[in-house]
Regions:
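Short, glycine/acidic-enriched loop or turn micro-motifs at the edges of active sites
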Residues: 67-68, 129
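C-terminal active-site subregion of NodB/CE4 polysaccharide deacetylases
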Residues: 1-62, 68-70, 135-234
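Acidic (Asp/Glu)-rich catalytic clusters
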Residues: 35, 76-82, 106-125, 153-156, ...
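Generic enzyme active-site microenvironment
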Residues: 62-63, 124
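Histidine-centered catalytic micro-motifs
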Residues: 7-9, 122-130
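Active-site glycine- and acidic-residue-rich loops that bind
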Residues: 67, 98-107, 170-174
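A short, conserved beta-to-alpha structural element at the edge of catalytic cores
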Residues: 82-104
Length: 234
């Protein structure tokens, strides 16, 4: 089975980055590394059609929360280095700010989402209300998922059937986990992404527990290179 690292980013800034915020300078260094070393990027919907990955270095780039900074700072770099990415968007917050976090960072508007080039950016779900699934009932999770689907349909958006769990949280107790996965499947979701910080094998053994590497703003390029090769560093 082939190895497939999936990167997770959030806010991008022109200043120094830390934690979930990365500087545009460091982001460019990382994207340049991927391009210079021949990494092939995929949209998640492309993986749904594949039984195996092509030979060589493969990777998936994801951004959570739909920040305007991703449009302003990350998108030009994706274009420059000919990379693809998936933007996971909490739909109730379009045109607002990240009230679950700092309340100061702007989320893209509906019009900005529609302006994204689908050849470069794939849109995926990040729930509707950005709440932890571990703190919601099964009925609330289903209602949230259905609201996402309704919103996308009502507004003429094109989303892939992929979902990144807010905070990386999902029900792990066996009975609840089975209901959770069934709920997502019934509503057409085919991939669910957590965090985990491990390198995936492809095809995915657990398509609703796909792991991502949390790229911290303070990572050096060396640490980034180690993370995409090994995942968790002990």
């Amino acid at each position: 089975m082939a190895k497939l690292p999936i990167l997770m980013y959030h806010h991008v800034t022109v200043e120094d980055g830390k934690g979930l915020t990365i500087s545009v300078e460091n982001l460019e260094k990382q994207f340049n590394h991927l391009a210079e070393n021949g990494y092939k990027t995929f949209h998640l919907k492309e993986l749904l059609k594949l039984k195996e990955l092509p030979k060589g270095k493969n990777i998936v780039i994801t951004f959570d929360d739909g920040y305007v900074s991703q449009l302003d700072l990350a998108l030009p770099l994706l274009k420059k280095y000919k990379l693809k990415a998936t933007f996971f968007v909490p739909l109730d917050f379009l045109g607002k700010t990240d009230t679950w976090n700092t309340s100061s960072l702007e989320i893209m508007t509906l019009e900005q989402l529609k302006s994204l080039d689908s050849k470069i950016v794939e849109l995926g779900f990040h729930s509707f209300y950005h709440k932890k699934y571990t703190e919601l009932s099964n009925a609330e999770i289903e209602a949230d998922t259905r609201r996402c689907l309704e919103f996308v349909s009502e507004n003429g958006l094109r989303f892939s059937p992929v979902l990144a769990y807010p905070y990386g949280k999902f029900p792990k107790e066996k009975a609840r986990n089975e209901i959770f996965k069934k709920t997502l499947k019934i509503n057409g979701i085919e991939y669910g992404l957590r965090i985990g910080n491990r390198i995936n094998s492809f095809p995915f053994k657990k398509p609703f527990e796909i792991e991502r590497i949390d790229v911290k703003g303070e990572f050096s390029l060396l640490k980034f290179r180690q993370k995409i090769r090994f995942g968790k560093l002990f």
